[in-house]
């Protein structure tokens, strides 16, 4: 299987932009397709801040100068909604804004992506919206599960793949596929064997086959996408959670880079327990200061699984502190062979050199 860089060229299905989706593209490599800031001697960066009193989740880029902000209601708001804004690149002020978009009552960070057809697709709660570049709603779809969904993948046929998030062990996470014109559902939902919290990633191999990677509570799975359907790859099912739940909890998102599926464990924390204690999610929200307090006693760990062989699972412990937690994927620089791991709960960041022959070597910690 061949690993490419999302930043090398236009991604099939995605708009021709330096940053058309969260993490920069479906492999979640977080590398922008741009030459950098090109700051010269005597030049400097200045900062501009705008506060809108809402939960600002992410930004994506469309044409040059077009920046779109996805957000949703403030945690204390009685109205549960999402929104899309086109913002000025210098002042950050709103140029145009969608109406408040119903979320089915859920408060959770969704996602936004720019499709190669020029439209933007927004997910908030259990709704999906299609919007034009002026933030006007073109189509909307209530999704099948009474659950929050966490963002999209765009496949090369233009379809959207989504998954609902489930914290409870006895709940089912399911894939749903929507066509991009009217947001009609394509085929039946596909159930995942374990509840899943993290966002999905996608890779394309040298034969052009698309693989969707999804974290389960104990196991990472991948599904082959073909003819608008998803089929579980039973030859690749690495089990990463090997300790009891008091010691180790689930993974969130993965980064697909340089022949590996990279992810962190210990994703559970006090915020999750509070947010997912109600349905719709987020009716009760955690007290400030408790959000990132981890529930697992084992220190944060970084994993790499070879995408050709799930038996080649490597793990390293970058930090020594307990009760850490994470919400996001690690990063791996395939040029310099450096992995970036973190522990949000304890405020730690580390860089680790990796080679397939020698494994991990810690370079620094902050």
Predicted segment positions?
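Conserved beta-propeller blade signature
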Residues: 18-20, 66-69, 119-121, 159-161, ...
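Beta-propeller fold detector
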Residues: 19-23, 95-100, 138-144, 185-191, ...
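Residue-level signature of beta-propeller blades and closely related beta-rich strand-turn architectures
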Residues: 25, 73-75, 126, 166-167, ...
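Blade-loop segments of beta-propeller domains
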Residues: 52-58, 72-74, 80-117, 123-125, ...
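Short, conserved, GDST-rich strand-edge loop motifs in beta-rich repeat architectures
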Residues: 69-80, 164-171, 265-297
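Beta-propeller blade signature
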Residues: 82-92, 172-183, 220-227, 280-308, ...
């Amino acid at each position: 299987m061949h690993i490419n860089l999302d930043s090398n060229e236009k991604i099939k299905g995605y708009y021709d932009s330096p940053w058309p989706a969260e993490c920069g593209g479906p492999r979640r490599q977080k590398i922008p397709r741009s030459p950098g800031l090109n700051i010269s001697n005597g030049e400097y960066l200045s900062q501009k801040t705008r506060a809108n009193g809402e939960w600002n989740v992410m930004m994506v880029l469309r044409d040059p100068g077009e920046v779109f902000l996805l957000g949703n209601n403030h945690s204390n708001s009685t109205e549960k909604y999402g929104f899309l804004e086109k913002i000025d690149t210098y002042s950050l002020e709103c140029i145009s804004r969608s109406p408040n978009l119903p979320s089915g009552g859920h408060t959770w960070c969704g996602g936004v992506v720019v499709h190669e057809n020029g439209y933007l697709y927004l997910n908030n709660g259990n709704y999906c919206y299609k919007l034009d570049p002026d933030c006007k709603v073109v189509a909307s779809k209530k999704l099948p599960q009474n659950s929050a969904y966490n963002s999209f993948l765009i496949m090369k046929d233009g379809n959207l793949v989504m998954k609902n998030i489930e914290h409870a062990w006895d709940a089912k996470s399911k894939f749903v596929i929507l066509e991009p014109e009217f947001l009609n559902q394509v085929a039946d939902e596909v159930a995942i064997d374990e509840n899943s919290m993290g966002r999905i990633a996608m890779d394309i191999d040298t034969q052009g086959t698309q693989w969707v990677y999804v974290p389960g509570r104990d196991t990472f799975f991948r599904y082959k996408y073909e003819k608008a359907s998803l089929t579980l790859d039973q030859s690749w099912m690495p089990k990463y959670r090997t300790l009891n739940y008091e010691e180790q909890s689930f993974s969130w998102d993965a980064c697909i880079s340089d022949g590996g599926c990279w992810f962190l464990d210990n994703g559970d924390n006090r915020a999750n327990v509070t947010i997912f204690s109600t349905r719709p999610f987020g009716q009760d929200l955690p007290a400030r200061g408790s959000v990132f307090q981890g529930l697992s006693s084992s220190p944060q760990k970084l994993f790499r699984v070879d995408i050709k062989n799930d038996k080649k699972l490597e793990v390293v412990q970058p930090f020594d502190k307990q009760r850490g937690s994470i919400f996001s994927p690690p990063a791996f620089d395939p040029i310099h062979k450096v992995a970036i791991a973190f522990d949000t709960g304890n405020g730690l960041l580390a860089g680790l050199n990796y080679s397939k022959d020698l494994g991990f070597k810690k370079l620094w910690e902050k």
